[in-house]
Amino acid sequence: MKYILVTGGVISGIGKGVIASSVGTILKSCGLHVTSIKIDPYINIDAGTFSPYEHGEVFVLDDGGEVDLDLGNYERFLDIRLTKDNNLTTGKIYQYVINKERKGDYLGKTVQVVPHITDAIQEWVMRQALIPVDEDGLEPQVCVIELGGTVGDIESMPFIEAFRQFQFKVKRENFCNIHVSLVPQPSSTGEQKTKPTQNSVRELRGLGLSPDLVVCRCSNPLDTSVKEKISMFCHVEPEQVICVHDVSSIYRVPLLLEEQGVVDYFLRRLDLPIERQSRKMLMKWKEMADRYDRLLETCSIALVGKYTKFSDSYASVIKALEHSALAINHKLEIKYIDSTDLEPSTLQEEPVRYHEAWQKLCSAHGVLVPGGFGVRGTEGKIQAIAWARKQKKPFLGVCLGMQLAVVEFSRNVLGWQDANSTEFDPKTSHPVVIDMPEHNPGQMGGTMRLGKRRTLFQTKNSVMRKLYGDTDYLEERHRHRFEVNPVLKKCLEEQGLKFVGQDVEGERMEIVELEDHPFFVGVQYHPEFLSRPIKPSPPYFGLLLASVGRLPHYLQKGCRLSPRDTYSDRSGSSSPDSEITELKFPSISQD
């Protein structure tokens, strides 16, 4: 097993996750099995109770793990399925050690950060690195570990010490450290400054880790003189200084690393069992990046949500929209609309914001209402849903978005004026959305219906069934406490709101479609968590197709992706060029 540790310096949020994912991508393109671990030095057990404003979205895994959004990057880039133990937090490791102490495993010893916490970290990493994450079930050969935060943070000290010891435990030829640092370029001088990187590497080396690669994040490509300066002061060769400058799309980052000889370096440094050959998977990334840069037509989607001021709150939703837009050869324009701005109360208090929000909504090609919690902004979302329904605008509601679509339909079509979710109005006489039986009140963490669940299609001719390739069932990830009241199903269906997908027991409403509408769909699950760049999520893909007016034509042609549209580079084909000529997204004609 080979371990690659990715650390960060100067500031957080400079793209360690994308760089770690890109390193995994180029290694996977060489035919290796790659897994990933994200370490977050906060004391929370998991990301389940985080505010989206503070930490971005909560990413949900197959096993129901609520984890950091960086694990979403790993899954999308590498097309793997991770588990909750691939996200290690200070809280998890302390809980693990304290539980062992309570059981008497330490035989009365004084339990300390060193050696007990640091040993537990190393054991966790070595154990988790061996868990298969690919569909073929084979054991990984490389584990990419991202240490969150920045070097020098007091929270990350136990992890730095653990990896200082770890590099000797697994031997130098099996361990490599990539340090990601910022090279700022003040506009006043236009000169690239290396001092922050020098200080960051000096601090890391003082803690016992010496970087093998220094990855410099910068606005523009590094000058040769700057590269040589970093090489001299950071104790690395010039070819070990890697420049990752701002690029048009993140699809270019793996290509950027490949061009600078990162694979050749790993080949020598870690003695990896790979051959120098043309790599099909990277060709697919290059093809995607080139397509992305050549897009001319634009499709605009109004994202009506509660957390629109911080785009990371909807990271996977945005990625799913981007994947689908690329598949239909359109640039994506997302119009972020704070749902409270659409409410009548805003018209009285801030009329300019109200009219600007409605202007954005009316000018969009399609409307998306994503998941969320809490009553604030729900009436604005209902207003947007009502507008999309009446104006025949393509609409997709995800989780809360689906629930509010049912509330809107109940109020404005069935005439139940007080129809609501019991989450917002426990005393409503028409509880169209109710608390779930699985929910255990009183404890915030882990009380929802989480993880991958199966949904069965109830009819042969629904739009969603066709988008999923005319299959009998689908498996998607869930994260919700409330659901559509099954008692009211008949009343809603009689008026044209069809529940075309239900759970295995037939008790939970999973997919809803409105008759006589170009595309009005609600899903209780979160399809964005399984969207991939080459395999866009069917609900989002349907929304984009409908938004550009091509859905009917696509449904007539049949909806299967090419079997070659996968990430696997272990197909045994000796002709990557022939595969690349067949790389095609879902077939869309220009009419």
UniProtKB/Swiss-Prot annotation:
Residue list for modification N6-acetyllysine: K100
Residues in Glutamine amidotransferase type-1 domain copies: 300-554
One Pfam family it belongs to: GATase
EC number: 6.3.4.2
Subcellular location(s) of the protein: Cytoplasm, Cytosol
Phosphoserine found at: S562, S568, S571, S573, S574, S575, S578, S587
Similarity comment text for this entry: Belongs to the CTP synthase family.
Protein name per its UniProtKB record: CTP synthase 1
